């Protein structure tokens, strides 16, 4: 369910704004999206894991807050590019 360090480094390199960027909202959204997709796969097998489902809802809310910040701070264009790149919305 957790992300490997190689996968996290790959996400940081892909979504970083500048070279040593590990904490921007873009990077955090990418990492949260990966964690959410891992938990979603977990729930396909373990349908009654309600404790982890609460954690999933917390992660989704945290990602939503970062996305709202990106939309407010950087504009709709950056927001749309990010959600298309992450594959969040349909």
Swiss-Prot record:
A molecular-function term among this protein's GO annotations: structural constituent of ribosome
Task: Report the record's disulfide bonds.
Answer: none
In the record, which residues are listed under signal peptide?
none
GO cellular-component terms in the record?
cytosolic small ribosomal subunit
- The yes or no answer to whether the keyword Ribosomal protein is present is yes
Keywords recorded for this protein, A-Z: Ribonucleoprotein, Ribosomal protein, RNA-binding, rRNA-binding
- Tell me, which GO biological process terms does this entry list? translation
State if Cell membrane is listed as a keyword: no
**What does the protein in this record do?**
One of the primary rRNA binding proteins, it binds directly to 16S rRNA where it helps nucleate assembly of the platform of the 30S subunit by binding and bridging several RNA helices of the 16S rRNA. Forms an intersubunit bridge (bridge B4) with the 23S rRNA of the 50S subunit in the ribosome.
Q: What family does this chain come from, according to its entry?
A: Belongs to the universal ribosomal protein uS15 family.
Subunit arrangement?
Part of the 30S ribosomal subunit. Forms a bridge to the 50S subunit in the 70S ribosome, contacting the 23S rRNA.
Q: What is this protein called?
A: Small ribosomal subunit protein uS15
Provenance organism: Wolbachia sp. subsp. Brugia malayi (strain TRS)
The root-end lineage is: Bacteria, Pseudomonadati, Pseudomonadota, Alphaproteobacteria, Rickettsiales
